[in-house]
């Protein structure tokens, strides 16, 4: 959520930022609402002052034995008017709040301007594209013989669900454990196992609600939602709290199942394991000092990159342009892994600094040594990594002509020493 004072005092700054995001939001609607709110508060204050004076006059007249009926009648009318205006004020305040929580974050000054993914800016790349003496296959061609069962997943539930057997299941488990070990042992993250269901307030805290409800799975006759990412529960762990400055930065990591309706993805990635309604992801969340969050963003990105480097997977990093960033982000880097079967790069991690946007919504503050009162800290999040997409990248990059897949060396201890996945299926 944006700072109300920023909107009131510098509406042109917010309008310019929203224009960069191509949000289509008209700032004058807020200005009119906020002006009406101020007018109501002034009018109520004036009426209450008048009522107080009239109450004093009634008391004085009664002490003097004078008839105060007319003034008492006026007092009743004033009270009725105040009651009406108070109700209208609350309605307008609620409208202002709803308008506020529908606004996206303001892009950082370093974010390139642009309309969509075509305007994202290349930052750097690591590694080389693998070479093959055969035409590399896509993962949905290799996968079934190694345990990716799209047919049974569809039969059990529906489209965009997959059953993992044997090598595929072992590889998913190995990747998850490997990611968590690197984060906790090498980068100082604390592992957390959060609920997979959260309430509406929690979803609002990180920005999924109210704007993106259609992207979520909600339990019928309940206020609970299935989480689309562990970012949601991890960030809200400190909602309503004041975190001591000396504890910053705080770093959490979690592996969870994630659930997304993919409402806006009709026709995209209908084949394979790239875009699922249910998938495993390891998430990184950091809570930072307000003046150090962009330094923390570079750390966060490097922690995601290290995983791809250890796996020997070629990737590139792009800075998202203003029109392609997520709702809560002030700046985002995307890590895109190379998939030789598809002959393209695919996103495998997004690392974002949300500045004080989520902290303001979830009321997460810190008490700085030189501040008189607590201030909102900054929150950051990133995929470390999307497990299913990493599995896809391994299948496509390490495939052999006979359909087998070489296991990256760092994963072999997690696979019981297995170095080669042989096509034993379909199962």
Swiss-Prot record:
<dbReference type="Pfam" id="PF00587">
    <property type="entry name" value="tRNA-synt_2b"/>
</dbReference>
<dbReference type="Pfam" id="PF02403">
    <property type="entry name" value="Seryl_tRNA_N"/>
</dbReference>
<comment type="function">
    <text>Catalyzes the attachment of serine to tRNA(Ser). Is also able to aminoacylate tRNA(Sec) with serine, to form the misacylated tRNA L-seryl-tRNA(Sec), which will be further converted into selenocysteinyl-tRNA(Sec).</text>
</comment>
<dbReference type="InterPro" id="IPR006195">
    <property type="entry name" value="aa-tRNA-synth_II"/>
</dbReference>
<comment type="pathway">
    <text>Aminoacyl-tRNA biosynthesis; selenocysteinyl-tRNA(Sec) biosynthesis; L-seryl-tRNA(Sec) from L-serine and tRNA(Sec): step 1/1.</text>
</comment>
<feature type="binding site">
    <location>
        <begin position="260"/>
        <end position="262"/>
    </location>
    <ligand>
        <name>ATP</name>
    </ligand>
</feature>
<dbReference type="GO" id="GO:0004828">
    <property type="term" value="F:serine-tRNA ligase activity"/>
</dbReference>
<comment type="similarity">
    <text>Belongs to the class-II aminoacyl-tRNA synthetase family. Type-1 seryl-tRNA synthetase subfamily.</text>
</comment>
<dbReference type="InterPro" id="IPR033729">
    <property type="entry name" value="SerRS_core"/>
</dbReference>
<feature type="binding site">
    <location>
        <position position="383"/>
    </location>
    <ligand>
        <name>L-serine</name>
    </ligand>
</feature>
<dbReference type="InterPro" id="IPR042103">
    <property type="entry name" value="SerRS_1_N_sf"/>
</dbReference>
<keyword id="KW-0547">Nucleotide-binding</keyword>
<feature type="binding site">
    <location>
        <begin position="347"/>
        <end position="350"/>
    </location>
    <ligand>
        <name>ATP</name>
    </ligand>
</feature>
<keyword id="KW-0648">Protein biosynthesis</keyword>
<dbReference type="InterPro" id="IPR045864">
    <property type="entry name" value="aa-tRNA-synth_II/BPL/LPL"/>
</dbReference>
<comment type="subunit">
    <text>Homodimer. The tRNA molecule binds across the dimer.</text>
</comment>
<keyword id="KW-0963">Cytoplasm</keyword>
<dbReference type="GO" id="GO:0006434">
    <property type="term" value="P:seryl-tRNA aminoacylation"/>
</dbReference>
<feature type="binding site">
    <location>
        <begin position="229"/>
        <end position="231"/>
    </location>
    <ligand>
        <name>L-serine</name>
    </ligand>
</feature>
<keyword id="KW-0436">Ligase</keyword>
<dbReference type="InterPro" id="IPR015866">
    <property type="entry name" value="Ser-tRNA-synth_1_N"/>
</dbReference>
<dbReference type="GO" id="GO:0005524">
    <property type="term" value="F:ATP binding"/>
</dbReference>
<keyword id="KW-0030">Aminoacyl-tRNA synthetase</keyword>
<keyword id="KW-0067">ATP-binding</keyword>
<protein>
    <recommendedName>
        <fullName>Serine--tRNA ligase</fullName>
        <ecNumber>6.1.1.11</ecNumber>
    </recommendedName>
</protein>
<feature type="binding site">
    <location>
        <position position="283"/>
    </location>
    <ligand>
        <name>L-serine</name>
    </ligand>
</feature>
<dbReference type="GO" id="GO:0005737">
    <property type="term" value="C:cytoplasm"/>
</dbReference>
<dbReference type="InterPro" id="IPR002317">
    <property type="entry name" value="Ser-tRNA-ligase_type_1"/>
</dbReference>
<dbReference type="InterPro" id="IPR002314">
    <property type="entry name" value="aa-tRNA-synt_IIb"/>
</dbReference>
<dbReference type="GO" id="GO:0016260">
    <property type="term" value="P:selenocysteine biosynthetic process"/>
</dbReference>
<dbReference type="InterPro" id="IPR010978">
    <property type="entry name" value="tRNA-bd_arm"/>
</dbReference>
